[in-house]
Amino acid sequence: MDKSKIRNFSIIAHIDHGKSTLADRILELTNTVTKREMQEQLLDSMDIERERGITIKLNSVQLYYKAKDGQEYTFHLIDTPGHVDFAYEVSRSLAACEGAILVVDATQGIEAQTLANVYLAIENNLEIIPVINKVDLPSADAERVKEEIENTIGIDCSDAPLISAKTGLNVEDVLEAIVNKIPAPYDADDAKPLRALIFDSYYDKYLGVVMSIRVREGSIKVGDRIKLMANGSSYEVTELGVKNPKIVKKDQLSAGEVGWVAASIKTIKDINVGDTITTVTNSALHPLDGYKKLKPMVYCGIYPIDTNQYQDFKEALEKMELSDSSLVYEPETSQALGFGFRVGFLGLLHMEVVQERLEREYNLNLIATAPSVIYKIHLTDGTMIEIDNPAKLPDPQKIKFMEEPFVNVKIMTPKESVGDLMSLCQNKLGTYKDLQVVDDNRMMLVYDMPLAEIIFDFFNKLKSISKGYASFEYEMIGYQESQLVKMDILLNGDMVDAFSMIVNKHFAYQRGAALTKKLKELIPRQNFEVPVQATIGNKVLARETIKAYRKDVTWKLHAADKSRRKKLLNKQKEGKKKMKEIGSVEVPQEAFIAVLKLDD
């Protein structure tokens, strides 16, 4: 294959700006799929991806395009997820490319998440082609958006294609720009030892783990013994090939190409995205740059509502782990919810997607506890432990100080929402860093704030304040000391472990009062009075009382029979006292969900 005719590229766009639609048009124009085979968002293979209109797993396709210069070019389109939780997957897929198409909606302009991915592309030295989409809509303002891109990122937009991915208008210009602007693979030398980047992996029940790779140097053939440079394990290549989007088998992939490799690998945990493949004989000396081990940022307990489903739930998690290497879980028990698992996620969207997939694909009925982050607890004896669950917090006497993860948050917002969003960030213990003007209508706010505050209803409030127009992205900046306490909820004097949470001291009273009030509304009245208390240690922060049903035991008495009346009321009082001592309170499922949705 002529290396100078290869073009490897990604499409970068914010959710709903038309990335998957543009990918579909490109597949049509290059005759990769016929109109009859076409289904919307062809590259998004999971139902949930099509429904939510977001790309979660990566996909790569090989296309052939006959350009206006009469030459035929081989394109490798690598689809990337656009959401902040999957930023590492984006950075790995960008590392497999030489160029990126930046799709921006002509009606909305550039968004915070897109900026983050553009900077990732610039870090990977990619050639960026700006494309303005949805120019056929009445509210489109392509000139303003061009100016915005030039001012914010500094990319020349004078000849940016103005397209409508939906109708196919000017999409041909995008293909010509790929040919003329994106460089051919610059380091593609078949003679060097093999170095190939793994940018994605998935599980196939016949082939085992299938790796999506970009061959940087050397070549890889069926029968080769390959070695993963991060952990040193070796395998024999059983099958390899490309996708167009159907799977096509080949004998060999050479430098510059993008394809897939299967090598009878049993579990996806053996494969790390971002790792480098080389051959056992004639090995490369150094892996490719940029490999990172992914760590979950958010944890929560997930339990089956029907305890008989525990085994099914366990098997479902094992199967999901095969296709999602960033998923981490361990068994956990709760007095309130029974047996379940503590599951770790990359972020909130990842958590929602996983839970939805478990319920939808495996017919499970699940309940999740409030999400929490990983806290670092420094003890008085000089040691440090990490916890992701309030139940694991040691005795306060043994704690010297606690640290929590902080993130740098960038918010793109219309000017009229700036004041309210600044108040929101301050209420979430944010530290103001910067305010930048993006264009006449929009500004960018920059804050540092605790990750725990973001996973707690920040996104919903941001959207409601800005009427849906603001967008945000965050990145980890490390751990900082915080005034943290563990808050427990007592029902009738008994602690309910599923309601415990670690909160900032400043918020403890607010959260406690809001939660007790909410639980009072949601827990049905019992035959006895039930106190609902929020406590820190022995100190009660807030209390609500669920009133008892009043049963009239004196209804059949004569009005003058006072001693009999007193006797019956005393008997009822004794009965209630006894009941209160042994009575357990039924907590409905809505109450557990209320903790997650608590709007303080």
Curated annotation (Swiss-Prot):
- Catalysed reactions listed for this entry: GTP + H2O = GDP + phosphate + H(+)
Q: Where is the tr-type G domain?
A: 4-186
Residues given in the record as GTP binding sites: 16-21, 133-136
Q: Which Gene Ontology terms describe the biological processes this protein takes part in?
A: positive regulation of translation
Look up the EC number in the record and give it: 3.6.5.n1
Keyword Nucleotide-binding assigned = yes
Protein name per its UniProtKB record? Elongation factor 4
Q: What is a single molecular function from GO for this protein?
A: ribosome binding
Class of enzymatic activity (EC top level): hydrolase
Give a short account of what the protein does.
Required for accurate and efficient protein synthesis under certain stress conditions. May act as a fidelity factor of the translation reaction, by catalyzing a one-codon backward translocation of tRNAs on improperly translocated ribosomes. Back-translocation proceeds from a post-translocation (POST) complex to a pre-translocation (PRE) complex, thus giving elongation factor G a second chance to translocate the tRNAs correctly. Binds to ribosomes in a GTP-dependent manner.
Q: What is its main location?
A: membrane
UniProt KW Protein biosynthesis keyword: yes
For this chain, the annotated S-S bridges are none
* Organism of provenance: Mesoplasma florum (strain ATCC 33453 / NBRC 100688 / NCTC 11704 / L1) (Acholeplasma florum)
